[in-house]
């Protein structure tokens, strides 16, 4: 019997699987140093983004789906 595939720890912290099956991610650059960025940039980086079709297959594999 083949052992079960483990979920990638880094991937489960970074990606979420939506109900429709697409993979969402947060935008980079939203951890600290906001005083050096304009409010416009900060607003643009909020919210979630979808992983591209080329990368979503790999992301799903890392999530064990």
UniProtKB/Swiss-Prot annotation:
GO biological process, one term: translation
Keyword field: Ribonucleoprotein, Ribosomal protein
Gene3D superfamilies listed in its UniProt record: 4.10.410.60
Region Disordered, annotated ranges: 1-39
Organism: Tropheryma whipplei (strain Twist)
NCBIfam families: rpmI_bact
Name this polypeptide is given: Large ribosomal subunit protein bL35
Taxonomic placement: Bacteria, Bacillati, Actinomycetota, Actinomycetes, Micrococcales
Recorded family membership: Belongs to the bacterial ribosomal protein bL35 family.
Membrane-spanning intervals of the chain: none
GO cellular component: cytosolic large ribosomal subunit
């Amino acid at each position: 019997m083949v052992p079960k595939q483990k979920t990638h720890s880094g991937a489960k912290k970074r990606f979420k699987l939506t109900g429709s099956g697409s993979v969402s991610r947060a935008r980079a650059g939203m951890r600290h140093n906001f005083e050096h960025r304009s409010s416009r940039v900060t607003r643009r980086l909020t919210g979630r983004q979808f992983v591209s079709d080329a990368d979503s297959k790999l992301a799903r594999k890392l999530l064990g789906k």
